[in-house]
């Protein structure tokens, strides 16, 4: 997978095992294994920088642990948290959960919402989360139509509104879920502009990897109704 990723032009990878109660999630062990793999990549001259995080499932136990130890689950311990919602439905009180996570210094990144049937049927439900500072990550395979037509349509609707902050491979193997980004990057650049594609695939991911604030963003569409709110967004993203 590392060779595939490097050949596709990927330079940084966040390794994200599931933190869902089904698999054992031990950050110290994950860090140890990633360090071993990083040394192997250097020996093999594969130019790939590895980081750690997780697919954070919204169980009661996870939420409480994240509130007491925010760095445990976030990307490289810096505060950006990849939040995975269920395949079907949404957890009750999700808006409040995002708020609780933000109150301890975490920045939630909602992963692959375009693949959730509830959100496919009710995309405006995401508006309040976005207004409150939740970020959005879409899967490259969805953009390319590899995750079904509904996911493809929603991915492009989100992109058209500039509601997306990250593209990711969500890679699991080298066949059906390979670490490939180039095709999606080129399609986004063609349809929505090269500046936006670079934000989603280079600038924003690198900022999250390093734990830095995101660079100035392209103003989202259809998110704020009056000019005062739009000006507030502009001020926020230019800090």
Question: What is each model feature region?
Answer:
Residues 25-137, 220-239:
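Extended substrate/RNA-proximal surfaces in nucleic-acid metabolism proteins
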Residues 11-17, 51-53:
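Short beta-strand segments at enzyme active-site cores
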Residues 20-23, 57-59, 115-119, 143-146, ...:
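Active-site environment of divalent metal-dependent phosphoester hydrolases
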Residues 16-18, 163-179:
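Short acidic/histidine-rich active-site segments
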Residues 186-239:
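Mid-to-C-terminal alpha-helical segments outside catalytic/metal-binding sites
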Residues 27, 120-127, 147-156, 160-161, ...:
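Histidine/acidic-residue-rich catalytic or RNA/ligand-binding cores of hydrolases
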Residues 138-140, 155-169:
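Conserved short secondary-structure transition element at the edge of the structured enzyme core
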Residues 6, 102, 159-160:
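Non-catalytic positions within long, well-ordered alpha-helices that form the structural scaffold/packing
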């Amino acid at each position: 997978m590392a060779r595939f990723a490097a050949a596709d032009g990927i330079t940084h990878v966040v390794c994200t095992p599931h933190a869902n109660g089904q698999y054992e999630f031990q950050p110290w062990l994950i860090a140890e294994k990633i360090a071993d793999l990083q040394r192997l990549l250097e020996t093999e001259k594969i130019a790939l920088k590895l980081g750690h995080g997780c697919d954070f499932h919204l169980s009661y136990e996870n939420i409480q642990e994240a509130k007491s130890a925010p760095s445990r689950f976030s990307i490289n311990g810096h505060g950006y948290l990849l939040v995975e919602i269920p395949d079907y439905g949404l957890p009750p009180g999700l808006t409040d959960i995002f708020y609780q996570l933000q109150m301890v210094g975490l920045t939630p990144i909602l992963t692959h919402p375009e693949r959730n049937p509830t959100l496919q049927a009710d995309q405006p439900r995401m508006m309040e989360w976005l207004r409150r500072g939740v970020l959005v990550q879409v899967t490259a395979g969805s953009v390319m139509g590899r995750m079904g037509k509904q996911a493809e349509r929603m991915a492009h609707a989100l992109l058209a509104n500039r509601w997306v902050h990250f593209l990711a491979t969500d890679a699991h193997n080298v066949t059906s879920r390979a670490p490939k980004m180039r095709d999606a990057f080129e399609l986004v650049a063609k349809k929505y502009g090269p500046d936006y594609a670079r934000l989603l695939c280079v600038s924003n991911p690198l900022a999250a990897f390093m734990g830095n604030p995101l660079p100035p963003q392209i103003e989202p569409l259809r998110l704020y109704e009056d000019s005062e709110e739009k000006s507030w967004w502009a001020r926020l993203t230019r800090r």
